[in-house]
Amino acid sequence: MPPWFRREKAGIRTTREEQNEMPEGQWVKCPETGEITNRRELEENLLVFPGSGYHFGMDSHQYFGFLFDDGDYDLHDTDLRSVDALNFEDRKPYSQRLESAVEETGQNEAVQAATGSVGGHPVSMAGMDFSFIGGSMGSVVGETVARAIKRAYTEGMPLITIAQSGGARMMEGALSLMQMAKTSAHLTRLDEAGLPFISILTHPTTGGVTASFAMLGDIHIAEPDALIGFAGPRVIRETIGSDLPEGFQKSEFLQEHGFVDMIVDRRRLRRRIIRLLNLLME
C-alpha cells in the first residue's frame, strides 16, 4: 500500500457529511499487484493501471473517444434491436435478458458502429461491448458488423474492428452462427476493393467472433495479456485431459506463434494505428 494512502494516526474520525463527499469507487485496486490508484488518474491513463500496465476493460464508446480524431464520430444502425425468435429461456427468458442488458449498459446491442477520421483518414469502425451479454454475437451484432464492413468498401474507407466477445449468442441458435458466414463474406468484398482491415483483439476475444471476422484482418493488433482463442482454457483442458502450455491463448503466446502481428499498449494504440493507416493508404 502506498505510504500516502496509509493512515498515520489512530482514532481519526470522518464525519458523515465528509464521507458522503467521497465519490463511490474513487480508489481502484490493481488485480495483479494490489496497488491502489485514483479513478481519475486511471481514466486519464485510458484505464491502464500506472506501473503494472494492467488493462481494465473499455466499452465501445471509450475506444471511439480516444481513437477518432478529437473524439468526434457518427454512430450508425443504433435502431437495430434483437428479437427472441426462439422464445429461448434458461435461467430467465432471453427477452428479459435483452431488456436488462439495454438498461444496464445504455447500449442497444453488444456492438456499436461508427465513422470518423483517424489521423485524417476516414474510417469505418465497429467496437464490441463485453458488458452486453458477454459481447456475444447474435443477428444484430452480425448485421451491424456486416454493415460497417459494407460502409467501408462502398465508401472507400479502411475498416477497424475492436473485438471483445464470449462468442456466438446461444440464445439465437443457428441465427447467431449464420453471422460468422455473413461477416466473413463481406470481408471478401472489402479485400476485393483493396482496402485494409485492422483487427484489434482485446480481452477476451473467443468463440464465433474469433472464428470469423476478428481473425480475418490484414493486421491483427492485440492488447497485452488478452485472452484470445476459440474455446476457453477450461473447456480445452477438460476435453484433452491434460494441462495447457503456460500462457496458452494469451496475446503474447499468440504473437510468438504467428497468430498476432503486434501487441500494443492501449496508450500507444492510436499512434500505431495512424502510422499503419499512413502506410496502407498511400
UniProtKB/Swiss-Prot annotation:
InterPro entries: AcCoA_carboxyl_beta, Acetyl_CoA_COase_Trfase_b_su, ClpP/crotonase-like_dom_sf, COA_CT_N. Its EC number is 2.1.3.15. The gene is accD. This is Acetyl-coenzyme A carboxylase carboxyl transferase subunit beta. Residues 26-282 form the CoA carboxyltransferase N-terminal domain. Pathway: Lipid metabolism; malonyl-CoA biosynthesis; malonyl-CoA from acetyl-CoA: step 1/1. It comes from Salinibacter ruber (strain DSM 13855 / M31). PROSITE patterns: COA_CT_NTER. The keyword 4Fe-4S does not apply. Component of the acetyl coenzyme A carboxylase (ACC) complex. Biotin carboxylase (BC) catalyzes the carboxylation of biotin on its carrier protein (BCCP) and then the CO(2) group is transferred by the transcarboxylase to acetyl-CoA to form malonyl-CoA.
